[in-house]
Amino acid sequence: MTSDVKISVQNLCKHFSTFTAVDNISFDVNKGEVLGFLGPNGAGKSTTMKIITGYMSSSGGRVLIDGIDAQKHPLLVKKIIGYLPEGAPAYGDMTTISFLGFIADIRGYKGTQKKQKIIDAIDKVNLGSVIHKPIETLSKGFKRRVGLAQAILHDPLILIMDEPTDGLDPNQKYEVRQLINEMAKDKAILISTHILEEVDAICDRAAIITQGKIIFDGKPEELQAMSPTHNAVRIKFTTHVPHSSKERLFVMDTVSDVVESETGSLLITPKNGTSIIRQITRLAHDEAWDIEEIFVTAGHLDEVFRTITTQTHNAYRQNV
């Protein structure tokens, strides 16, 4: 029986002289899953992807792609992987159509099948307007889409993409995210990104890497739940903030903090991410507060990311 685990990274290490870029990391990506690989610059994301795709050797550990050892059988692995490298490199003097034709030739397609593969890739990433233009004349966003087209041309089982929406405008980002969501149904997808909203939009799981180590691996909502403002309640009053409101809120044993904004609203932060919306709405009703809107905040991924990567960086510096 074929396993659902399509990417298996086991105790992977990469050293450059005395510098450790990847430090004994392990994770799996299953069929039908999109894993977002997050981390600050220099964290080890791109190095890990280069090793997984067989473009760089490891210093230790191993990578299995659909059960195949990537180090022992690099060509076999590359046949079943679609890879969008950092910066989406391509031959600048080639036109979009000739470059994709070149990729199709490398992949072994000929005749009608080759033509159809190229057409499908162009249609999926909306490259029709630039197919006869040299790649070096294209905008950063179009170059990225050319790179994405070559990665999906052969309809791979596994997709590995380094910053797939880098340089795209909001509409293009939306289109690419929709495409990734559609493809994720029958593929294993690994993307690296520094765009935290992307994790929330398209990823089933998020892994945060810093200093070459994975410090979080879980669902985006689990990451969001680590935010100090997870389950916080924001109240906007119709006229002004009632004088007694802060006092009444602070005495609640589930409330950690109450902050008033310049715009006349309150942000009520719960202790330990507890859900407090029912208590707040009951109090608002009892006190007859004149409320324009009230809502619960899910939390902010950026503050969680900043907190845990900074803590790890500071701990690392103390040990150097």
Label each region the model flagged:
Residues 107, 206, 227, 231, ...:
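Conserved NTP-handling cores and scaffolds of large molecular machines
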Residues 4-9, 14-210, 215-216:
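ABC transporter nucleotide-binding domains
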Residues 31, 129, 237-239, 270-272, ...:
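Non-catalytic surface loops within mature trypsin-like serine protease
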